[in-house]
């Protein structure tokens, strides 16, 4: 009995380690790829605070909040999009791009509130599947002002309990949408 319990404990710890190691690897990769991007992001935010730019709302990471249970899944679903800059409109985005270019400060991706219009994928029966947690856009909190942006970036991503559930749902629904597990594993649309 003690041996069986020890074996189960070992298996649980092994799974926890694999999950954390996988998350660490993903975050490292994001960090490496974002090295140049981070400075441009900071430059835009600082220029906005100093009054040299206007119409900057912040990053995607700034406009959403996530329950602890879904943090890993949402971070993985968003990836580098977390660092995209939300602006009031296209003009604010263009001014920011010109500012970055004129000052050789790198590049950034902008999401103007007035032009990014997202819709949530509606798949009949999906909410009844065992292990289905919700569509990613429904698992984050945000001001209604950002509805179009949040649905654009998270409205076609389902969050599920585990990889077995993800595989089952992906096959059943023809790989039509991205699926992320609570521990950060991904099955992309199209397979």
Predicted features by range, described:
Residues 1-7, 11, 18, 25:
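Residue-level encoding of the coiled-coil heptad register
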